[in-house]
Amino acid sequence: MRFGWLEVAALTAASVANAQVFDNSHGNNQELAFSPPFYPSPWADGQGEWADAHRRAVEIVSQMTLAEKVNLTTGTGWEMDRCVGQTGSVPRLGINWGLCGQDSPLGIRFSDLNSAFPAGTNVAATWDKTLAYLRGKAMGEEFNDKGVDILLGPAAGPLGKYPDGGRIWEGFSPDPALTGVLFAETIKGIQDAGVIATAKHYILNEQEHFRQVGEAQGYGYNITETISSNVDDKTMHELYLWPFADAVRAGVGAVMCSYNQINNSYGCQNSQTLNKLLKAELGFQGFVMSDWSAHHSGVGAALAGLDMSMPGDISFDDGLSFWGTNLTVSVLNGTVPAWRVDDMAVRIMTAYYKVGRDRLRIPPNFSSWTRDEYGWEHSAVSEGAWTKVNDFVNVQRSHSQIIREIGAASTVLLKNTGALPLTGKEVKVGVLGEDAGSNPWGANGCPDRGCDNGTLAMAWGSGTANFPYLVTPEQAIQREVISNGGNVFAVTDNGALSQMADVASQSSVSLVFVNADSGEGFISVDGNEGDRKNLTLWKNGEAVIDTVVSHCNNTIVVIHSVGPVLIDRWYDNPNVTAIIWAGLPGQESGNSLVDVLYGRVNPSAKTPFTWGKTRESYGAPLLTEPNNGNGAPQDDFNEGVFIDYRHFDKRNETPIYEFGHGLSYTTFGYSHLRVQALNSSSSAYVPTSGETKPAPTYGEIGSAADYLYPEGLKRITKFIYPWLNSTDLEDSSDDPNYGWQDSEYIPEGARDGSPQPLLKAGGAPGGNPTLYQDLVRVSATITNTGNVAGYEVPQLYVSLGGPNEPRVVLRKFDRIFLAPGEQKVWTTTLNRRDLANWDVEAQDWVITKYPKKVHVGSSSRKLPLRAPLPRVY
């Protein structure tokens, strides 16, 4: 296997150890170009709710050989087993097949007889913790029933720095608090169903352009390294790390490191983000897995905190691996300490036991690589047994109900001048626009949904699933209108503008459907290389709206999109009587929409992002051209914490629709704000102190002779194994640079297993436990002042004070039901983290002495209640 594994590892480690500052001469923030080293990689200790699972993990790992431990850490290769990623097995100890990891955050990818759930952005639009949990639980049940151990989701990266970022729809919202809560609830739901959840993509994975070298070169960009997202420490903590802290506190079992570099160190070998922030500061007890082919070194990644390499090979189907045999070699020759591989295995097995995989596990009953019933056991090389690979297990249960409910609960009513709800008495209804109809190639006609044909209910990429069916808006509206005795006329060709004009001129109400799509960078649709080229509507959408509006004075516009689109040309046209954003609602799309259109569901959704007048309104453009020669493109996050509504507030720019905005068929009033300091004597902040125990080791390493390929083993071509060809470690590694001195490439302290000092901001999963002590109670009275029952989403924002802070930041929210005339007192609390800022010098959270205020209302700019916060330190 001649591919310079140790050479790559050595160079990578040396660059970190020597604190090399990469060229970033174009930027204003030179200090952002460097990621400080942090070693050694913290070892798991089973804190809190992890204790029992950790104990069981230690027990089984103590019985494993080195090769068995390595087998758990390394995927067997792309298309080598049933799942998109699958580790080796440990049959001697009852792990008879490798751990199965499978996409995606909205349903099972590459499968059948599964559900297609609403996207993460729709969950954010509900602002509903219970619905987030129930969706996670339903997805977890389906993955479990298919034999999946690790669900590769949910996502909080990208967070949403760029409104045109290709994968923002997979996550939740550009607000860290909204994302963090729904991220955590989704994780709880998945893991309560017995499946390991994966918090991804960690971290600063905010655009698709330049995320992978080969992909970028395929689009004609001459780069040799992936993009570097360069951020300061305060912004990292207060914005991008925030939801991952919530995920760790919720007990997430796995974290997926990202393709991009962070401050010029690759995400899956960045000791600052993996060792320090995730494992030492946030106290993460689970395992870190690489994104697929985001693993760039052997020793460097192992020492920097990576625990699992996926899918195991360096490039898809090349049969080469940074780990596998090479990880075995590196432990035997002392390059990687035994305790580090022990910790990898313990972390993996701890997550396994924590969610109950030992009780629930069944073999994968589907193949990711074919829909045929029979196929090769090892698809990539057509080897192994020709066997039954698909059992066609229907795992949908009754999940269509929660999908339909979330679809309706996430339908944002942006504008309504009395057009909605429809009465059902409309005689002639026009349904206009391609986005209302079916994909002529079928709902799953485009691989990984990589096209924009028909209605948009899911965007594209690995974050997708096959639809079991797709109820289009046209189908659902037609069924509704016919049942009411009316007439419905549909034109779903966006080029048929004259026909649309004819229908619109005859209709009592015209429903216009438009969309905007995006996705993962390995697919380009109409020149959109994952990221959107702009924020305009797709498929001639503006012309469709203009045509219909000019012929019908009761036009309702429905937008299916991955994020914000530009609507400034037409949103205030008086003939546009209502605007709906329906996002990416999944398989029940049409039914969910009709429930809202006809008033069976009173809309309560709130937009999870800001609707600006222009792309420039959002700040810095997405990086679409290399800016560092053929080196790593440099994306400096110079805006700091000021993204989305925080950016608009800083610029004092009025958006078209602000973050948190959403109308209802009723009205709500806010009154009687009360703010009360809680007993602070028992809640003083206590920085964590002390040190860890020494790094534990489990079992004996043995010698090279113990890890030769087993006699009689029929090797599968390109399959990644942990064993050695020879007792000569240099020969087994087959690396021309074998034998380098450790001092040339091992970072200082990287192999130190002695007790290590605890970080002040650490101490428990999620960070210092006293960060989560409640300091202030806030209550307000919410009244339904209208004539229709409905849900309202009260939102609490805090002004943290200080000259360089956002005007307000969201901290708490809820979704409460109120009958007409009903009042409820909504009560919530603010904890220390809610009121603190990250102090870069102190490396800890600090409540500053600047005066602070609390604001309560229905959106980020409709905050009728406000009061000063009591001083709490």
UniProtKB/Swiss-Prot annotation:
Localisation: Secreted
Top-level taxon: Eukaryota
A GO BP entry: glucan catabolic process
Catalytic residues (UniProt): D291
A molecular function (GO) term: beta-glucosidase activity
Similarity comment: family membership: Belongs to the glycosyl hydrolase 3 family.
PANTHER family referenced in this protein's UniProt entry, alphabetically: BETA-GLUCOSIDASE (PTHR42715), BETA-GLUCOSIDASE A-RELATED (PTHR42715:SF29)
Protein name (database record): Probable beta-glucosidase A
Species of provenance: Aspergillus fumigatus (strain ATCC MYA-4609 / CBS 101355 / FGSC A1100 / Af293) (Neosartorya fumigata)
